[in-house]
């Protein structure tokens, strides 16, 4: 599915369209469709951190045309390491997707309001052994 990027992704401001695809039951991929060939691996945060919660600022809600009835998904970018346990998740910049109109944004959260969220939080912190 092709998603329209409604607000620039940090470091990838020229990207306006991305291809969304499922990797497996845990991970998905966003691949750039605009010039530069890059992709992100994302994770559904609720699979590893069920208490993950944040408010989507009104600005982003308007960009996505979100309503309480919207079919919305939230993912977080994963930095893949040699092992899954060493891989990190960016909980400070979730990707919000409105499946009703195929739009997406990366929401940048304020560390003052979300002191327990980090840019590079190891997945090992959330995997039960």
UniProtKB/Swiss-Prot annotation:
GO terms of biological process kind: bacterial-type flagellum assembly; regulation of translation
Annotated protein name in UniProt: Flagellar assembly factor FliW
Localization per record: Cytoplasm
Gene3D superfamilies per record: BH3618-like
Source superkingdom: Bacteria
Keywords: Bacterial flagellum biogenesis, Chaperone, Cytoplasm, Translation regulation
GO cellular component, one term: cytoplasm
InterPro entries reported in the protein's UniProt record: Flagellar_assembly_factor_FliW, Flagellar_assmbl_FliW_dom_sf
Family: Belongs to the FliW family.
Family annotation (SUPFAM superfamilies): BH3618-like (SSF141457)
Effect of a null allele: Cells grow faster and are about 55% less motile in a swarming assay, flagellar filaments are severely shortened. Decreased levels of flagellins FlaA and FlaB but not FlaC accumulate; 3-fold more flaA and 4-fold less flaB mRNA accumulate in mid-log phase. In double csrA-fliW deletions, flagellin levels are slightly lower than wild-type.
Functional description taken from the UniProt entry: Acts as an anti-CsrA protein, binds CsrA and prevents it from repressing translation of its target genes, one of which is flagellin. Binds to flagellin and participates in the assembly of the flagellum. Overexpression leads to increased levels of FlaA and FlaB, but levels of FlaC remain stable. Involved in post-transcriptional regulation of flagellin biosynthesis.
Pfam family, one: FliW
Source taxonomy: Bacteria, Pseudomonadati, Campylobacterota, Epsilonproteobacteria, Campylobacterales
Subunit-structure text: Interacts with flagellins FlaA and FlaB but not with FlaC; recognizes glycosylated and non-glycosylated FlaA equally. Interacts with CsrA. May form a 3-way complex of flagellin, FliS and FliW simultaneously in which FliS and FliW do not directly interact.
